[in-house]
Amino acid sequence: MGAMAGSEPMVDDLGAEVPVVRPVRRVVSLVPSLTEAIAATHPELLIAATDWCTHPPGLAVPRVRGTKNPDLRRIAELAPDLVVCNQEENRRIDVERLRAARIPVWVTRIRTLDEAFAALTRLFVVALGTERPSWLPAAEQVWAAPPPEPLRGAVIPVWRNPWMVVGRDTFTGDLARRLGLRLVHADRPNRYPKVSERELVEGVEIAVLPDEPYVFTEFDGPAAFPGIPVALVSGRDLTWYGPSLLTARTTLTDQLTRARHQPAARPGEIPR
């Protein structure tokens, strides 16, 4: 494939050599957070994204299905210089199939805020060959302040039927800690453990319900936490690593504060 000509080997976050063409002019992003980061910084490079890439609003590029089922044939037809993936968001088999088709793939690994800042720097400077985005150091400064004390026991569900929650070694868990939350299920062996309804609320002082991947709403979710403050938050603020980090700390802090000061719902009651 032509994208391999005139390339030089770079090493992605997983240690894989990636023959990156210079200059990079055509990028397909299979990660919503990274799509927003690239579109906000160098929109001219982005030639396709997934159906889940909702930001920035009005993003007008071809879509190549989802993060877990990308249209590999369509991606190959677009002849990208680079495809951007993430270890957690995308499947290894899809990365391998793209590479087998001689398409360069850069995989990021992000499980903490610090890893996010480092991975974003490497993506832009090493993989894309651009300058470090100006919003990155600004976002680092936003999150440099220590977390409020004491930490409050929290649960962050990501699914129900069955209930699944944020556990250990996750970007969302690290971000939550910096907001003053202690995830009560962080000691479990799985990163996103399944829990029973009883386990769901044990030791929980506040429940944080995002609108992705499961769409929790005031009518779907809060009733499972009777007597416990519930914060309904944007999944983008809680789980995305990109320009949203500039405002996410203030937004989430305000939402957590409001939840703690609102009367907790009684059994069967919908929180206001």
For each of these PLM feature ranges, what is it?
Residues 1-272:
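N-terminal ligand-binding lobe of clamshell/alpha-beta domains
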